[in-house]
Amino acid sequence: MLKEFKEFALKGNVLDLAVAVVMGAAFNKIVTALVSYIIMPLIGLIFGTVDFAESWSFMGIKYGMFVQSIIDFIIIAFALFIFVKIANTLMKKEEEEEIEENTVLLTEIRDLLREKN
């Protein structure tokens, strides 16, 4: 049972997921800082306040906090979209190169077989 767990835990997909979770947490801090210290002050110039969480409320319902969370989510989602798009582009290039190497190797094998016959 321990051996099976070790095989499972050391599989590429599990390790990739673990790395992704850690990187996602670190990336979240970067995006939160971007939103809090750069984007929200710019939006604050338009609306007159930076902190929607405290200033936008009605009878104890802090809908400003909800608006701020939506802005955070949109920025994080967009940044992740760009990151995944770039990663997919890079992975596609690697796959194309690998296919070309296989094609060259198969062509050489075919040519050698033709020479033997």
Curated annotation (Swiss-Prot):
Gene Ontology MF: a single term: mechanosensitive monoatomic ion channel activity
Main location: membrane
PROSITE patterns xref list: MSCL
Recorded GO CC terms: plasma membrane
Disulfide bonding pattern of the chain: none
Lineage: superkingdom: Bacteria
Topological category with respect to the lipid bilayer: Multi-pass membrane protein
Compartmental location: Cell membrane
A Pfam entry, by short name: MscL
UniProt keyword terms in alphabetical order: Cell membrane, Ion channel, Ion transport, Membrane, Transmembrane, Transmembrane helix, Transport
TM spans (from-to): 7-27, 30-50, 64-84
Gene3D superfamilies, sorted: Large-conductance mechanosensitive channel, MscL, domain 1
Subunit field text: Homopentamer.
Matches recorded under NCBIfam families: mscL, PRK13954.1
Function text: Channel that opens in response to stretch forces in the membrane lipid bilayer. May participate in the regulation of osmotic pressure changes within the cell.
Family: Belongs to the MscL family.
Name of this chain's protein: Large-conductance mechanosensitive channel
Species of origin: Staphylococcus saprophyticus subsp. saprophyticus (strain ATCC 15305 / DSM 20229 / NCIMB 8711 / NCTC 7292 / S-41)
